[in-house]
């Protein structure tokens, strides 16, 4: 599902479900589009597509880091990214990208800070993903995160599995200030990674990228499990 107003992205989402659950999933996504805090859309697109092969992989381990404010949170995020070999100036460029917001997908930065996504407005959209019911239940019941964590862990686990070095993300929900950094070491939820009413965004860090990897990010189907 993708929802927008006057061409500006408002919300998106997707599910990977069995045939008998399609109607339930469509209604859930429609409700999300119509009630999103970023505003009422004038355009909603819901696409239903048959998937022949689904990959099942384990979720990245989830760790929450509580920070007092945005400055502290950014330092924590930067430290995690620096440990993955990402230069400080590239991290700072990524912060500027997510703070600008407005992209439907992810920006892609190499270690020289060059933007590599083919379409800078669209970005690269990671699709055909979902979490298993038992993973969702574990996250919510054990207080590991929120519904947004359930959605985000699917993206993070898939992209790291496919060879992305790291991901930096803040939510496009204006009131949700917890963001995350994902690496092969885990999914790090970081509170106050942005301020209330600020936009959000997503950046993937790579050594290099080609059409084949972009295709896999966008098209290969993954269900994330325990």
Curated annotation (Swiss-Prot):
Keywords: ATP-binding, Biotin biosynthesis, Ligase, Magnesium, Nucleotide-binding
InterPro entries linked to this entry: BioW
GO-annotated molecular function: 6-carboxyhexanoate-CoA ligase activity; ATP binding; magnesium ion binding
Cofactor(s) needed: Mg(2+)
Reactions performed catalytically: heptanedioate + ATP + CoA = 6-carboxyhexanoyl-CoA + AMP + diphosphate
A Pfam family annotated for this UniProt entry: BioW
Pathway note: Metabolic intermediate metabolism; pimeloyl-CoA biosynthesis; pimeloyl-CoA from pimelate: step 1/1
Keyword Mitochondrion carried by entry: no
EC annotation from Swiss-Prot or TrEMBL: 6.2.1.14
Alphabetical GO biological process terms: biotin biosynthetic process
Family as reported in the entry's similarity comment: Belongs to the BioW family.
Role, per record: Catalyzes the transformation of pimelate into pimeloyl-CoA with concomitant hydrolysis of ATP to AMP.
Subunit record text: Homodimer.
Protein name from the UniProt record: 6-carboxyhexanoate--CoA ligase
Species the sequence originates in: Methanocaldococcus infernus (strain DSM 11812 / JCM 15783 / ME)
